[in-house]
């Protein structure tokens, strides 16, 4: 097998058999970074020297027969919202946040206890408030699948998927408030998991929305996602990693409304082809309108909860930053300042009602399938103003935001390429705290249709 396609589990096994050293693995990642980073711009901060020192320490321990956990020695990129000791946190803004933000929160601490190796901090949209991945302060990462035009990578975890395609990391930590893991995963041909609110702690992560923020991961395959989830999820400690669910007899719901509106025909075709493969393999596919989508998305379109919560957070902690925000972020923050407390509380109540009502469908289906993103990643030049950016940003998050607003878990996995030769994602949605089951279903689908590198081929990288 091509070493570039080895799974996390295979890398971990080779490290423990001493067929591979952690230093050699980090050196390979650093070589990929050095060759491609000037073009792709995945990272705000690259920490290659410390990563190599950490790898040498891992090798010493492995030579002594010590094993500190499944992620030991594996290279991980971390979104620049997370605190990582010794690395500045910018949160996509024009200056580093106070040093206290460098403290590791519970999720990074879990990674570090296992001696997973942080190779660097990846770019984010400023304060994570955007779905396309743009950043006016530090530059927008380039989608690796677009060799001749600068297309966006998706956001707000803008550099996360790029780091995986680049080969500088094998696992990426991101966050998801309206699609910020799944949109970049979809647009760069990766797998991305949005956890249920509260499943993984968000302490030690710069907040966007106190109501909706979730920690998540991006991986190259669903197989890798299952491995990483088992390693990071405390509720799964002592349990085996999620196992593939049989496709035959699987009850698959395909919503007919909202998710397919004004969709790129080539994206619709790729997703529908995946659904048909499931039906041919014995899945029971049923189609119906998903209730409350339009009502919930109308709230999202008017700022949802996140805009008001970010405005309040900035006003309390960083009021001096507001006028220096990227204009595509600043305008929405300013607009949210006009939302009354009564309207904010009304929105919360409506969204709770909508999510609970729509979740009753999971009594009759095991999973909901939709396109992850309904449009091809736009060219950066085509979204250079607030007026051109706003509709493209809203459309990018239209399908992913529903699971956030409803309080569900969700993931995306690649299923093909669109007419622009850009990756297409299939979104799986499940009820709250059903992550392990959802990953198992995705494993079954991946076994049927193939992993991303087999489905998509390889991008034309430098």
Swiss-Prot record:
Catalysed conversion reaction: (2Z,4E)-2-aminomuconate + H2O = (3E)-2-oxohex-3-enedioate + NH4(+)
EC number from the UniProt entry: 3.5.99.5
Pfam families registered for this protein in UniProt: Amidase (PF01425)
Keywords from the UniProt entry: Aromatic hydrocarbons catabolism, Hydrolase, Plasmid
Keyword Hydrolase: yes
Family of the protein in this entry: Belongs to the amidase family.
Descriptive protein name: 2-amino-5-chloromuconic acid deaminase
Organism field: Comamonas testosteroni (Pseudomonas testosteroni)
Gene name per UniProt: cnbH
């Amino acid at each position: 097998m091509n070493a570039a396609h080895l799974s996390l589990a295979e890398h971990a096994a080779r490290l423990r058999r001493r067929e591979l050293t952690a230093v050699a693995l980090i050196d390979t990642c650093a070589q990929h970074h050095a060759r491609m980073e000037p073009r792709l711009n995945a990272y705000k901060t690259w920490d290659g020297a410390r990563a190599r020192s950490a790898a040498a320490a891992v090798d010493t321990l492995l030579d002594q027969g010590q094993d500190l956990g499944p992620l030991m020695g594996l290279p991980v990129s971390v979104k620049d919202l997370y605190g990582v000791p010794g690395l500045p946190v910018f949160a996509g803004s024009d200056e580093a946040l106070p040093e206290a933000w460098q403290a590791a929160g519970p999720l990074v601490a879990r990674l570090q206890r296992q001696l997973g190796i942080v190779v660097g901090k990846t770019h984010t949209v400023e304060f994570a408030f955007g779905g396309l991945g743009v950043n006016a302060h530090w530059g927008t990462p380039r989608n690796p699948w677009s060799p001749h035009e600068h297309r966006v990578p998706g956001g707000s975890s803008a550099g996360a998927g790029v780091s995986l395609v680049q080969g500088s990391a094998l696992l990426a930590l991101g966050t998801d408030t309206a699609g910020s893991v799944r949109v970049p995963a979809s647009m760069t041909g990766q797998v991305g998991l949005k956890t249920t609110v509260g499943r993984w702690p968000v302490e030690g992560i710069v907040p966007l929305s106190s109501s909706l923020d979730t920690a998540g991961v991006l991986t190259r395959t669903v197989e890798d996602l299952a491995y990483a989830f088992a390693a990071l999820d405390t509720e799964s400690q002592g349990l085996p990693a999620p196992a593939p669910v049989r496709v035959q007899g699987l009850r698959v719901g395909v919503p007919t409304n909202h998710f397919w509106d004004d969709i790129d025909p080539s994206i619709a075709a790729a997703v529908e082809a995946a659904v048909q493969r499931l039906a041919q393999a014995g899945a029971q596919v049923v189609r119906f309108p998903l209730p409350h989508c339009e009502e919930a998305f109308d709230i999202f379109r008017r700022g949802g909860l996140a805009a008001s919560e970010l405005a309040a957070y900035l006003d309390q902690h960083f009021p001096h930053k507001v006028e220096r925000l990227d204009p595509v972020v600043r305008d929405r923050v300013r607009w949210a300042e006009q939302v009354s407390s009564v309207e904010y509380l009304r929105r919360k109540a409506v969204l709770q009602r909508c999510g609970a009502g729509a979740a009753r469908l999971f009594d009759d289906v095991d999973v909901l399938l939709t396109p992850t993103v309904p449009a091809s990643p736009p060219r950066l030049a085509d979204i250079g103003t607030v007026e051109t950016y706003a509709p493209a940003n809203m459309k990018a998050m239209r399908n992913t935001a529903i699971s956030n607003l409803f309080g569900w878990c969700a993931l995306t996995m690649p299923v093909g390429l669109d007419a622009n030769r850009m990756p297409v994602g299939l979104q799986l949605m499940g009820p709250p705290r059903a992550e392990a089951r959802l990953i198992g279903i995705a494993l079954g689908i991946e076994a049927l249709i193939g992993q991303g590198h087999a489905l998509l081929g390889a991008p034309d990288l430098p």
